[in-house]
Every structure is written in C-alpha cells, then in structure tokens.
Amino acid sequence: MVRQHTLKNIIRATGVGLHSGEKVYLTLKPAPVNTGIVFVRTDLDPVVEIHGDARAVGSTNFATALCQGDVKVSTVEHLLSAMAGLGVDNAYVEVSASEIPLMDGSASPFVFLLQSAGLEAQNAPKRFIRVKKPIRVDEGDKFASLEPHSGFRLSFTIDFQHPAIGEDVQSTSFDFSTTTFVKEISRARTFGFMKDLEYFKNNNLARGANMENAIVLDDYRVLNDEGLRYRDELVRHKVLDAIGDLYLLGHSLIGEYKAYKSGHALNNKLLLALLEHQDAWEYVVFEDEAQTTPISYVEPAFVGA
C-alpha cells in the first residue's frame, strides 16, 4: 500500500518574509491522517488555521496567499513544493507572521528541514488525484493545462526578451519523482528584475528580497556574484512554483501539467476549473502491493545520496 506520510519530529526555522521583510518563526509539526497541510497563525489570539486548499487562495500578487476572512498566510508555494516533492501528506505549519519565510528563495532549505524532521508512514492509503479529461485555462497568450498521463509530468515555457536568458533555457520538462525534485528542481531560486524595483517599493512588495535569496537581473545580466545554480534556473523555478501551487489540490497529481508564461493566478484558475469539472478527475489509491505506483517517492533520509 502507498501510505500517507507526516513528519516524525517537530522542527523549527527562522527567516525573513519576501514581501514584508519581517522576521518570521516557522514550526513544522506532525498531523494525523487525512489532515492535509494546515497553516496556523500562532501570532494571533485566538490562533487561526487555514487549510492548504485551492479554494482558500485569496491573492496571487507575486506569491500565493491563503486567506480566511481578513487573515492570510502568503508565499506558501516554496514550502508546499517541498512537501509535494517529498510526499508529505499531513502537517501543521505554524507561522508567526502573515508570510512563510523566503529562506534562500528556493525550496531547498524546506527540503532540508523535512529531511531533518524525518518522515513517518501512516496507517492510511495516500490519495492521489488522477486527471481523466483535459482542462485548460487561458489569459491572453498565457495558458496552463492539465491532461491525463500515467505519472506526473510538468512542461513549462517562459518568454523573457533578455540578453542573459537565451532561447535554449526558456523551456523545460520533468517527469516528477522525489529524486528529480530534490536534485533538479528544489534548488532553483525566485528571481526579479531591477526595472521592477520601483513598482515593488511603491506597493510595499519584495522588502525582504536581496541577492542572498533571489536571482536579480538588470537589463543585461545576472547580478548575483555566484551566477546561476542551473543554466535554466529561471524556468526551473517556475516549475518549482507550479508544483507548490498544484499541491493546493490537497493531494499529489497523476497527470501532465503544461504551461506557457503561467503564474500563481493562472495556476489557481486551473485548479478551480479542474475541481469544478468533477468528471475530469477522480481520487485513486494504491492498496495492492503488486500495483505499480505512478510516482516514485524515496525515503527522504536517502534522497540526497
């Protein structure tokens, strides 16, 4: 049986919010079967819980934010991407502010935290969502789609007219597995352009961003001294974001995601369209040991080896 997983131990971290620039305390805790990923604002009295659910997305302005009334938790996508990558089904995410800390701008620090906490198999089958019929959403020339597929595949194309971003590094595809995620996707950092800095400042955005936690480009080149972690790091980060956004379905996907210039808003629109068309998907479990699992999850302790 492919089982649900939670954390073995409680683990804590501290970081800075991408948009707020505030210091944030983060605590990841185990949760019972069928809990899902629940975000808990511990700085409020009483505390407020917000489930990691596509229907709870309230804002997608340069990050995905979950909302309940006027309470929100923003920039959830990198942590959710790590949860999806390692196959964590159930966890409580306690946070001391309205934003998950940015860490180094990738999902890698969250992968390390989850690996350090350890994963524990639970006595219940893991539920997947299998795409049965194609679903597509468009916005101008942008699109995002889900199609039936035997595993979980992601294909993404960006379109930046920039000297440092060649045509050959604007598209990528991955067949998802824990190993692929950790080695090929998790280290890709968020990025921004100097020309957008004024807009960010005027709108109180990206106050926590710097070259320690983001790729920064001027009109000609990458400004970070160490350069890029992958030649196509920008499009890989878009895949990382998409994995996190898609995990707001509450379950791992069996299907193929394709996107052109998509972002958090279009990803969420895609999930809502899928959920609305109930004939386009189904829940599946793998209880028979003889069944081949469509997605390969590796015990996190051995992933980095």
From Swiss-Prot:
Residues the record marks as active site: 264 (proton donor)
Obligatory cofactor(s): Zn(2+)
Gene3D superfamilies hit by this protein: lpxc deacetylase, domain 1, lpxc deacetylase, domain 2
GO aspect biological process, one term: lipid A biosynthetic process
Annotated positions binding Zn(2+): 78, 237, 241
Pathway: Glycolipid biosynthesis; lipid IV(A) biosynthesis; lipid IV(A) from (3R)-3-hydroxytetradecanoyl-[acyl-carrier-protein] and UDP-N-acetyl-alpha-D-glucosamine: step 2/6
Reaction equations catalysed: a UDP-3-O-[(3R)-3-hydroxyacyl]-N-acetyl-alpha-D-glucosamine + H2O = a UDP-3-O-[(3R)-3-hydroxyacyl]-alpha-D-glucosamine + acetate
Described function: Catalyzes the hydrolysis of UDP-3-O-myristoyl-N-acetylglucosamine to form UDP-3-O-myristoylglucosamine and acetate, the committed step in lipid A biosynthesis.
Family: Belongs to the LpxC family.
HAMAP family referenced in this protein's UniProt entry, alphabetically: LpxC (MF_00388)
NCBIfam families per UniProt: lpxC (TIGR00325)
Protein name: UDP-3-O-acyl-N-acetylglucosamine deacetylase
Organism: Marinomonas sp. (strain MWYL1)
